[in-house]
Amino acid sequence: MINKTAAIIAGAGAGNRLGANLPKALVKLIDKTLVEHAVSSLAPVAQLLIVTAPAGFEEEFRKVLGDQVTVITGGILRSDSIRLALAQIPNNYEYVLVHDAARALATTTLAKSVVEQLVKGEQA
């Protein structure tokens, strides 16, 4: 895409309702973690990817995701995590997509469609 798009993936959820002993975003679905699925869907659309991780799990997220993303410590609430991630995005980005790692099966086609609508001036 020609425009500068950033994507925030909220992954700081604890996963308590899932009964997992690790953050929800690190739970595996088929062959990859939820956050890996989310990153792979958004990577073709966004030039900057920021993932929020629960405090104490940042290194595990970095090991799973590698250098293609920026991992930051999330906040107590989802809104805190998004605010912290927004503060990391340089001013020259035109669009910011906000996605939840737990919604890991959203497609690249959907993300491209959202950006295309934003470019046209639509709200998304």
Residue ranges and their predicted role:
Residues 26, 71, 123-124:
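Conserved beta-strand scaffold positions in the cores of enzyme catalytic domains, especially
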